Every structure is written in structure tokens, then in C-alpha cells.
A protein has these predicted regions:
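Peripheral interaction segments used for macromolecular assembly
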Residues: 1-97
Length: 97
């Protein structure tokens, strides 16, 4: 898997472009911000498979990048929402470029 380089590419599951999705905040079901999107990840065929998210730490210090499967994310009222808590994010696979 690799990061999508075409900012105009549409993420069909979210009906938004890569450029729109990158840097969006991710919220839990209670409306609490728990992460931020760093990149969209695609497979060898160009199919969107997930999002690279940054979570934990303070102001980027001590934070971690992980892969969040695209099926775990929904766009609701202009926000990316997951049915996970901040405490569950460390169990996600780490992103390695």
C-alpha cells in the first residue's frame, strides 16, 4: 500500500477528494476529536484502502501514525466519524512509509 498522490482523486466511500480528506479531524461517536488524517492509502490497483491517521501526543510530539481502514470511517455532517474511542487507536496497525 502507498499514499495517494493525486489530490483530485475521489475517495468513493466518503464522496470527497483526497485533498478534502487530508488534514480532516476524526471524531468518535460522542463528538470528541481523537485523530487527524495525514494521508489516503491506496493499493496497487488504485483502490482506496484506508487513511493514515495521527493520534496521541501533544502538538505532534509523541504522536503516532496508524492505518484506519476506510470501512471504519463515515462522513457525517461534514465530519469524519469512527465507532472507536481514543483508547482503541493504539491497537491500529502502525503506518510505515
Amino acid at each position: 500500500m502507498r499514499e495517494a498522490e493525486n489530490d483530485d482523486m475521489i475517495v468513493p466511500q466518503l464522496n470527497a477528494s483526497v485533498d478534502d480528506v487530508e488534514d480532516m479531524d476524526i471524531y468518535d461517536s460522542t463528538g470528541r476529536k481523537i485523530a487527524e488524517v495525514e494521508a489516503v492509502v491506496i493499493d496497487g490497483t488504485g483502490t482506496v484502502r484506508g487513511l493514515v491517521i495521527e493520534h496521541g501526543g501533544l502538538l505532534g510530539i509523541g504522536s503516532r501514525e496508524a492505518i484506519l481502514e476506510i470501512g471504519d470511517v463515515q462522513l457525517k455532517d461534514g465530519r469524519l466519524v469512527v465507532n472507536m474511542t481514543e483508547e482503541q487507536l493504539p491497537s491500529l496497525p502502525e503506518w510505515r512509509k
